[in-house]
Amino acid sequence: MPKIIDAKVIITCPGRNFVTLKIMTDEGVYGLGDATLNGRELAVASYLTDHVIPCLIGRDAHRIEDLWQYLYKGAYWRRGPVTMTAIAAVDMALWDIKGKIAGLPVYQLLGGASREGVMVYGHANGTTIEDTVKVALDYQAQGYKAIRLQCGVPGMASTYGVSKDKYFYEPADADLPTENIWNTSKYLRIVPELFKAARESLGWDVHLLHDIHHRLTPIEAGRLGQDLEPYRPFWLEDATPAENQEAFRLIRQHTTAPLAVGEIFNSIWDAKDLIQNQLIDYIRATVVHAGGITHLRRIAALADLYQIRTGCHGATDLSPVCMAAALHFDLSVPNFGIQEYMRHMPETDAVFPHAYTFADGMMHPGDQPGLGVDIDEDLAAGYEYKRAFLPVNRLEDGTMFNW
């Protein structure tokens, strides 16, 4: 058996903060796992160092399921983003090791490919509708078959999903959280105009997506869904705060627009009721925050029973290690829907060389043994951790609101 003899946490900031777990075995094979939790990176790093790594030494790296259960059930204080991100990092690293020892890419260990490639969607954003459509046309020219649309709202200085750079979006700021002002009425007026302009310019052969980011009430989300139905949205993401899961039933009663949720979910228990009551169309749970490949497969299997597809979170707050793991999962799972893909900064790609590729709107994890991603530790050491926080929202009267 390949015995775990050591493990360490690597923290680096090549454009943004990433936490990586590296597990070493007595056979000279190592595996990598992403342990990044945006804005709470050091909490996961400490959890791994103090509470997880000591429990890994001497264990059989091939016993992925047993180690998953050990870390989950042995924690007693189960679930939550810190615990599940730490477990996910271990899980990814162990799949990486297993693939390297077997000489196979991880997707082959998951049952093989269910498709030739993974359809991904890019992010088109701009301060105006015109700017956003221009960027969307650029993505379409690059071969993207699905594009997320976000644009600035007149009268609001800053809006979620809109970056200063048309490709690289990183909302976290150094020092203390930025406080933005939010107006729901203005937002509800601009989004249908954005979709109308996009359809007129891009046509009907491209999927259009939108992220509400938890900021609407159920009835507001239903209204927006109705307004967007003529433009055939691929999905509305995070229409309302996911803690109130019964709210999705009310949204369902008012619109046929497909609903997606789950990027903040940490376990199958967070998604179970939404799936079994068929209140969503896409489950957005991601590898690093939902317990790794092992647990995400369980969530997907449950969703498959109800014809609900996957649509994993894939923003730049996940490292290329997680992106690779997601693509192996996507390629193998039968009820795959779509994969979010935000390109990383060149500095990030240099620190994390990877085998996955993009062509004609599709991605593939590559056929290198394991996950097909590595870390240049010398280069990573040159990018020191920088404390950063995600923004917060306030209504115009000063009331705290969902970002």
From Swiss-Prot:
Pfam families from the UniProt entry: MR_MLE_C, MR_MLE_N
Active-site feature positions: Y160, H213
Bound cofactor: record note: Binds 1 Mg(2+) ion per subunit.
Listed cofactors: Mg(2+)
UniProt: substrate binding residues: N38, H123, E263, R284, H313, D317, E340
Reactions accelerated catalytically: D-mannonate = 2-dehydro-3-deoxy-D-gluconate + H2O
UniProt pathway annotation: Carbohydrate metabolism; pentose and glucuronate interconversion
Binding locations of Mg(2+): D211, E237, E263
Keywords of the record: Carbohydrate metabolism, Lyase, Magnesium, Metal-binding
UniProt enzyme class: lyase
UniProt superkingdom: Bacteria
EC code(s) of this entry: 4.2.1.8
Keyword presence, Lyase: yes
Any Gene Ontology biological process: amino acid catabolic process
Gene Ontology molecular function, alphabetical: magnesium ion binding; mannonate dehydratase activity
Site (Important for activity and substrate specificity): A315
SMART domains to which the protein is assigned, alphabetical: MR_MLE
UniProt key word Metal-binding: yes
Entry's family note: Belongs to the mandelate racemase/muconate lactonizing enzyme family. GalD subfamily.
Physiological role: Catalyzes the dehydration of D-mannonate. Has no detectable activity with a panel of 70 other acid sugars (in vitro).
PANTHER family: D-GALACTONATE DEHYDRATASE-RELATED, STARVATION-SENSING PROTEIN RSPA
Name of the molecule in the record: D-mannonate dehydratase
